[in-house]
Amino acid sequence: MKFLKKIKEFLLNFLNLTKLFSNVKNIAIVLLAFYLSGSIFNLHKIFLGVISLSFISSAIYIYNNFSDLKSDKYNKNKDYYSEAVKYFGEKNTLVLNIIFIVLGLYFGSTINFYFLFALIALFIIGFLYSFKYTRFKEKVILDILFGATLTFLFRFIAFWFIFSISLPPILAVIALVSAKSAGYMLYKEVDRPYLTALKIKNSITIASKKTIITISSLLWFISFLSFIFLCLNSRYFQIEYLGKLPLNFLFLIPLAAPPLAVIYLSALNKIKTQIKYLRILGFCYWTLIMIIVWILLI
């Protein structure tokens, strides 16, 4: 029983440190890039793309947890991240970080130069976000830009380069970047008390809760509007550089309501459930949505 307990403890801390389940979003993004590109399905390339980008994403998460070791232990929404770093030790955490980077870049190099370039850019963005001499996560505007906007932009661009060496569809980029930026603002709004206590001045703490929620809502509106035009474009406009999705994908819009309601209620302090449990529920929910989308595509 002690052995099983140790295995469970190891796995739990490993998952908390690397946030592997958060990489499920990479599957959704690569499927979107594949469909919009109109390319022939290539499971080998898609698999390598998801694996390599997930290694880089987890490397960014690991380094962020390492950099936030002292501050996270005072945040009940993130204290398990600092516990994970302590469990493995700071030295081993950095070693694991390097291993993930090397593996990500190695697998990425087997696809093409453009994909590898996007991976490197993504890592640099994540590094600057958390690095103690830059700490863009504690800077106004730069926190959202490097913590959300650019990260999803380069995730999508990287996957797009698997299928096409060209500019990605504009509407898809706008939809993804707006949604990620909006979600990031709400996610950080939940941490406002801790950020304020640490006297951190970033986009969240210098603005009021009402302002953050208003801007986030506007970004969600832009994202949904872009998605609607992506669907309508396939039948009514036929503008290639905008991107096209099946018209019947419009039914997916109401499915975004439950997770949006949860994150908004959390930001308004109406839900007391810890973020880590909401993440687990979100993982299960979006995995189910991806299965539904895949069934529609085939």
Residue ranges of each PLM-predicted region?
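Solvent-exposed interhelical
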Residues: 54-107, 177-227
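Intramembrane alpha-helical segments
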Residues: 10-12, 82-165
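Short, Lys/Arg-rich, polar N-terminal cytosolic tail immediately upstream
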Residues: 1-15
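Extended hydrophobic alpha-helices typical of membrane-associated regions
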Residues: 236-298
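Membrane-embedded alpha-helical segments that form the functional core of polytopic membrane enzymes
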Residues: 28-67, 115-128, 166-186
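Helix-coil boundary and interhelical linker segments in multi-pass alpha-helical membrane proteins
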Residues: 33-51, 104-117, 154-174, 228-246, ...
